[in-house]
Amino acid sequence: MKKTVIAMSAVALLLVGCGHTEDAKPAHVSNTEHKASGDAAHAKHWNYSENGPSHWDEFSRTCGTGQHQSPINIIPGKTMSMNHDYDLSMHEDVSGMASIIDNGHSIKVTPEHGGSITLHGETFNLLQFHFHGKSEHTVDGKRYDMVAHMVHQNPETKQLAVVAVFFTEGEKSAILDSVIDNVGKSVKLDPQDLLPADDAHYYHYVGSLTTPPCSENVQWYLLKTPKTASTEQIEHFRKFYVDNERPVQELHDRVVEVN
């Protein structure tokens, strides 16, 4: 495995998704911004139905006015070679207890002890990972069957970095079974089981949270090689949340890099 790209740590536990970061506020989100228009008081009311993505600017203005929003459509033919200042290093080979909950927006897994990744020489600690019934990002317009978002945060700067693992229909995933069977409980999980065999190739760009408050300056890493999940597993997650994905946003002046 290439250490310059992606690997998972001896202190890490489990990963998570990225849009939802109720347990961390990015450094650049001031209290004024977060509370504007009653954001903090009303954030719990956003959803994917009557208060869905087209109304999220009512909960956080950034969702409607931000110029660097996520998710986006990745067009491989329009990407640039990776700036290696942003190479990602994860350290695998860990297992530990993690709590699994239905938080009203997705199925979320939170490790008892945080893991970490290294990004441009800085450490980002694992906060949680969660699932979307379909991928939020698309590649050449294609939406994957499922996605896991692994959310990490720099403890000093509070900047966020999210690793996205796509899933396609195929062989059953052991780690997904563990998650499905233990919602509302704690269970021992190994984060290495969530990663594809080829975790050394990915897309990178700077975007945002994919849920309110839609805060920007989030480092996104989307693994190119998907994992597989059985038809039954995919259908089970969609029983919880069939449409918990935000529509793709405009790229504007951003560059998508590929490694």
Segments the model singles out, each with a brief description of its role:
Residues T4, C18-N259:
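Alpha-carbonic anhydrase
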Residues V11-A12, D39:
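Residue-level signal for mature regions of secreted extracellular proteins and peptides
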Residues K2-M8:
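Sec-dependent signal peptide recognition
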